[in-house]
Amino acid sequence: MIHGKMKRLKRYFTRALHRIQKGPGYTYKELLVWFCDNTNTHGPKRIIKEGPKKRVMWFILTLVFAGLVFWQWGVLILTYLSYGVSVSLSIGFKTMEFPAVTLCNANPFKYSRVKPLLKELDELVATALDRIQFSSQNQGNTFTHNNQTRQNVTLDPALWNHIPLVVIDETDPRNPIIHNIFDNNAVYSKNSSIRNSSEDQTSYSQRYKVAMKLCTNNNTQCVYRNFTSGVQALREWYLLQLSSIFSNVPLSGRIDMGFKAEDLILTCLFGGQPCSYRNFTHIYDADYGNCYIFNWGQEGENTMSSANPGADFGLKLVLDIEQGEYLPFLQTTAAARLILHQQRSFPFVKDLGIYAMPGTETSISVLVDQLEHMEAPYSSCTVNGSDIPVQNLYAEFNSSYSIQSCLRSCYQEEMVKTCKCAHYQYPLPNGSEYCTNMKHPDWVPCYYSLRDSVAIRENCISLCQQPCNDTHYKMVISMADWPSAGAEDWIFHVLSYEKDSSHNITVNRNGIVRLNIYFQEFNYRSISESEATNVVWLLSNLGGQFGFWMGGSVLCIIEFGEIIIDCMWITILKFLAWSRNRRQRRKRPQYSDPPPTVSELVEAHTNSGFQHDDGDHVPVDIPGTPPPNYDSLRVNTAEPVSSDEEN
């Protein structure tokens, strides 16, 4: 039975092979005529059935409309391949998770804790300020000593030699004069005043610039980084020195130097229920020191939700920033720094945070923007950052992916690769160490070179992609004085007692901050993307264009495909036949007669005159042989012939 099936299958494939080898059996012209006569498209039928003039007209119309169809098809296909999206927006109110709230003091360390560590640096900055006097009464004697304060101060070269602070005198632009502020041998006198009383501030700022001298390769290559303000230059220089100093301090030591949660957070209330600093999670920020997160939602923590709008159903806090503990040369702003962010995401307070001013009540109403992007190929977003070729240095905090964490991690990788050390403000990669002036004397010029590099910035931006699902918090902020003049005495007494159980007033208007954070009447706005085009849209529009211009359908396309296949089939068979004939012509011998023998060749060479010309030879007809005429071959006996003798 199996053998019979195999034989039938073999015969079927043999017949199919013969049909393929034979081809459709038509010429190109016959196929085209058949197509025009049998297709469901209207135009081609007119080409073969109308008169000569109408044939030309219908032929032109058919070509024009066919061109329009193919053009529209191209536009539709390109639109589909562009993977466009449509955006939908919905606004409303519902019970939602309350955002995570990160609180920091704008000043990272208590001055009483770090004063011994920064004593020499602060004296250095104070001396530099005396040598750069910005006093309107003194008319800007920039290089004059203050004879009553630090005229005889000698600066320690070990602290400042790595990054000298200078003033550039550009009175003569072709020959600028550079004055080193920290040069102990320089002459500073009132006679060397760089600004006269008749000069205005604009002329002064254009002629004299405070700059940092950045040198590499053992001070053989130096550049000057200019600043428009001496205050800005000193603060930038102070931050660099501070980074180098605290890079040698372990994390536990830096945490002890900062503000404790019980000192920063005085009162807490959420949804009308009391809370305390114990409901906050500690995190260390390189810029603001100890920070505390409410409702972060890490593993094992329950997230809090809010079901009603208004301040009574939100978070209420009273903070004490202890402005008396501020570092004099580090932070020029007195405030609390806060940021609202998504649960389990790292708070980038410096980049995205806002300030809350002391002596005020700051109310923040929140609107949640939920963004949903389409994945590839509709966008280049990433789901969880696993496909990003940048190591997430913030993964140690068990936080989700964000574009800020990616950009900072990318910059830190470039810093380690180029400068051979890591920057103090970013997490430390494995196998690297933070930059210090003693171990890495060239790190500051390298750091500025990377920070100012457009190529590095664009490279990191191209590597880091936005998350497909993200949440942003739109805030409306209002402020009022708090407490009022009539209530401040008893409020400060109560807060001071609750803070340290003392009847002495330790809390005052310069350090107190009150915060109200709550949802608006409409607390969420969902912005989601969906595909603007799909396969159904593409097929529908392709068919619509074809039906409108040509009056055809999918069957017409199949018929056209059939005629194309038949034409290709005929072409292939013709090519194979041509190739076969060409091979046979190559195999055919050049001479039709058999080659001559050796004796014939010798005779033709010795007596060529006897050789006859085959072309002149006329063949002799061979006479035909008549058929035999025997009586024995006859079937019937022949009649006797009478002779004359008998007659």
Swiss-Prot record:
Membrane topology category: Multi-pass membrane protein
Function of the molecule: This is one of the three pore-forming subunits of the heterotrimeric epithelial sodium channel (ENaC), a critical regulator of sodium balance and fluid homeostasis. ENaC operates in epithelial tissues, where it mediates the electrodiffusion of sodium ions from extracellular fluid through the apical membrane of cells, with water following osmotically.
Main localization, broad class: membrane
Region (Disordered): 586-647
Name the UniProt record assigns to this protein: Epithelial sodium channel subunit beta
Organism: Xenopus laevis
Keyword flag Cell membrane: yes
Family that this chain belongs to: Belongs to the amiloride-sensitive sodium channel (TC 1.A.6) family. SCNN1B subfamily.
